[in-house]
Structure formats: structure tokens, C-alpha cells
């Protein structure tokens, strides 16, 4: 064993003392620090917020550095993402600027299960399941009533609250981000949100449990070339209820679809397109840029897109009407064409 290993572990343990009240609780599964002084933890009742003066920015950076050294890794502006394991077996994801907002640091700790649960206990609270194949009945869709009535504000509000995957489409300056911010405001406050964008435009309630991640390229003058795909992968280790990706531009579209299809429903994103069908087509073509999709036929990827994206909202800025921005089309996979 490396002679420095015990010292490195001791350093991590020392800096983890500020989190001991939550790490020691058996009923807590996730611990998240979104910004200095603010901690969120998830127990059987959901997410809870706790203020902690010990979690200063300097302390968080010291913990990040100690964790990186313990794992023989680096965390710095050039390498702002760290996925590692703590001495106690907990998994940790750390994000530092420029991949998150200046003056912040994101820390997510997932505690391992301390016992092996017998199958009988795991299934104790299972919903009643049909004993005969094919006997299950589809649940009523609460979105169909406002959809049929053309009550679009109610429809979109319920869609967000129901965790539908929504794509906002439109041309430059059409109001895509404005609508995405309005939709984000309907996300239930109990959820944990991770946003991914190149420039901070998404606005969330400061009181909610959220983290803003930022990507860039060397040509934009950023110190770190962190891609949207890298941040999507990091976000999946940050206990998100849902992921908001400000704009889809390339192969990261496939990673976004994978995230939405793997238990992180309710994703919202935007793309440049003039109609719902063009948006679905563009999203399919973006997926084809992903290394894992380049040999897949268009029809296969189009089917994937339409199986994951529930709703496409098209916005438009019309000249000659006071440059008014408005919704001009809504596509709903489970509904009839919009009237």
C-alpha cells in the first residue's frame, strides 16, 4: 500500500466531519450540496433542506481536493468533474467551476445500502398487479381532457407536473428559452433539478433544490472544454429528479433521450425547428451524430425519439404584430392532432 494512503484517507475523513450528522443517519440515501452553506438530503419523506455554516466554499474545495488525492485524481478548472468513492464506500460526484456557477461547488453523495433486503420486504408495498397477462388496464390520461378542449395552459401545466418529456422548438429569437423558463416554473418543488446550458439563461426558484451546470469549448475562451455529453453523464450521478438541457445541438441529443428513458422523466429541452415534425426530424438527425448511433438506420432512431419525447411545443415570433411571440403548434404523442 502507498505510504501516503492512510494520510489521504485521514484528510478525507477530517473534511467529511461537517457532513457527519447526515452521513451517520441510516434513513438518508442522498446528500447534496448545491452551493456553500446549503445542504439537501433525501430520506423516506423526500428532499429536505438544511443550512450549515460549516460548509463554506473553502471547506468544500478542501474536501474536493482531499477526495481527488485519495483517488489519485485531479479536480481543477481544467478537470472540473470528479466521480469517485469515499473511504466509507459512498459514491460522490463533485463539480467545480467553470462547469458550475462561479462561487459554488456541487457535491452529491450517494450512500450504499447497509443491508441486503429480502425479496418479501422489497415487494411488501408493491401495487396490486394483475395475475393474468394482458389483464392490466391503462390508467386514464389526465392530459386528454385539456388537450381536447384546447386548454393549452392547463395541458402544459399538467404535462410538466406529470413528468412528460417536452421539447420546445422554434427559430432564433422565437421565445424558446422564455417558454422553457415558464414550464420549469411548474415543476413540483419537491423535485431535484439539474440544468445544463452553455450560458446561464434558465431561471429557477432559488428556494428549490437545483444545480446549474455549464459547458463550453476552448474556442469560447473557457478554461475547461467540458461538453454537454460529459455534463449529462455527470448529472446522472447527481440524484436528479429531472434534467433540463437548454438546447440540443448535436450528438448529446441521444444522451438526453437515454437519460429521459432511464428513470429521469420530465426532461425539457429546446431545438431550432419551425414545426413539430421538423423538430422530431432534427432530433433524429442529431442522434445520428452520436458515436453509438452512426450505424443505426434513421427509422430506428426516429422511433426512439417518438417513444421518449411526449410533447413538442412550437413557438414563433411574427413580424408585423408587435414582434409578438406565441405558441403556434403542439404535438402530443398520446393525443390527436391539435385542433
Swiss-Prot record:
The gene is ptlH. ATP binds at residues 170-177. It is found in: Cell inner membrane. PANTHER family: TWITCHING MOTILITY PROTEIN PILT, TYPE IV PILUS RETRACTATION ATPASE PILT. It catalyses: ATP + H2O + cellular proteinSide 1 = ADP + phosphate + cellular proteinSide 2. One of its GO terms (biological process) is secretion by the type IV secretion system. Induction: Cotranscribed with ptxABCDE. Activated by the two-component regulatory system BvgS/BvgA. This is Type IV secretion system protein PtlH. It comes from Bordetella pertussis (strain Tohama I / ATCC BAA-589 / NCTC 13251). GO terms for cellular component: plasma membrane; type IV secretion system complex. GO terms for molecular function: ATP binding; ATP hydrolysis activity; protein-exporting ATPase activity.
